């Protein structure tokens, strides 16, 4: 077993298969009884309907809304559509997810909001614990960030100064939610320029980034830097480069020709972020955490006895994307179909 600083992985990530009821306040509780987890991000997909029949992907995130109260109403982010992000106010009667609860979440039934609570339909939910909900926008240009604009490991920070040295202005970092234990961070960055660097508040170099513009001008983009035990690599050399594609679209996961300037302390704005001027981007960032997460590349052999990919732990979720060919992202988890042979 790989050495890990994550004592209980289920405190940071859970998978839930559930059924819609069509009724108001459909409370979904996680299956695990050893610990509870209040999620910050929930990715949901219908098992009963394809995307063309209304079974859309939605990423529910409490951090995207500019919330100041205690009620956590999630925004709806559409990963594989160019639809703009749907924001909801402080009313618990709006939005498909009424609340993120102490050990699950509660669904609504009103109108189109019941898209993930249709009676008789089955759904999958992949749920992450980030760093909690920041409740203020950062306006500081140097030194400490505005109080409560960053939440670290569930605690709002009243006087936090980024330790990393970076070139982008501090005022571009509007909100941050970071889980330093599991290695995941959410950021809202606005008005940056290509090449600007910003702290990502994690303990190691990011290996996967999901980016969604605030406007409806593009699908969620996935950037993946291939990793091994010791270094970041690319098949054509040792540069810190990777692969990029739109989330769950049937496009080719192609080589990203640029060298990434991401390091163990900062990440770099890219020329296709569309962040110039007042445009904002939302970033969900992961770094590899031994015993909790693994990001790597393998080569298929075309046989029923396929290659064995070492993770160092028993994964609850495996996401696969074929490189260099038009194919969707594929999700495997420990709750949807569990008939595969388990190899400890």
Range-by-range predicted roles:
Residues 1-344:
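Surface-exposed molecular-recognition determinants
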């Amino acid at each position: 077993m790989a050495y890990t600083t994550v004592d209980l992985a289920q405190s940071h990530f859970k998978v839930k298969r559930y059924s819609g009821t069509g009724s108001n306040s459909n409370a979904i509780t996680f299956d695990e009884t050893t610990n509870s987890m209040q999620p910050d991000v929930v990715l949901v997909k219908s098992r009963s309907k394809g995307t063309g029949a209304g079974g859309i992907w939605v990423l529910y995130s409490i951090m995207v809304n500019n919330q100041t109260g205690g009620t956590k109403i999630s925004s709806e982010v559409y990963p594989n559509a160019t639809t703009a992000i749907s924001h909801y106010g402080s009313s618990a009667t709006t939005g498909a997810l009424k609340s993120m609860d102490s050990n699950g979440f509660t669904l609504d039934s009103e109108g189109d909001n019941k898209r993930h609570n249709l009676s008789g339909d089955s759904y999958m939910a992949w749920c992450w614990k980030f760093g909690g909900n920041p409740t203020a926008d950062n306006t500081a240009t140097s030194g400490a960030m505005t109080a409560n604009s960053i939440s670290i490991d569930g605690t709002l920070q009243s006087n936090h100064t980024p330790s990393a040295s970076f070139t982008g202005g501090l005022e571009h970092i509007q909100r941050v939610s970071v889980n330093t234990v599991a290695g995941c961070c959410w950021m809202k960055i606005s008005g940056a320029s290509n090449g600007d660097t910003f702290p990502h508040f994690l303990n190691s170099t990011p290996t996967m980034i999901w980016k969604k513009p605030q406007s409806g001008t593009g699908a969620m983009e996935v950037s993946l830097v291939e990793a091994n035990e010791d270094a970041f690599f690319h098949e054509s050399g040792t540069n810190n480069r990777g692969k990029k594609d739109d989330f769950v679209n049937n496009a080719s996961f192609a080589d990203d020709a640029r060298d990434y300037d991401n390091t163990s302390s900062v990440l770099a704005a890219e020329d296709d972020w569309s962040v110039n001027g007042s445009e904002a981007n939302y970033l969900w960032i992961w770094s590899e955490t031994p015993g909790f997460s693994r990001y790597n590349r393998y080569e298929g052999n075309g046989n029923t006895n396929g290659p064995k990919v070492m993770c160092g732990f028993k994964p609850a979720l495996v996401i696969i994307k074929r490189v260099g060919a038009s194919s969707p992202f594929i999700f495997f988890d420990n709750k949807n179909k569990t008939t595969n042979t388990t190899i400890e």
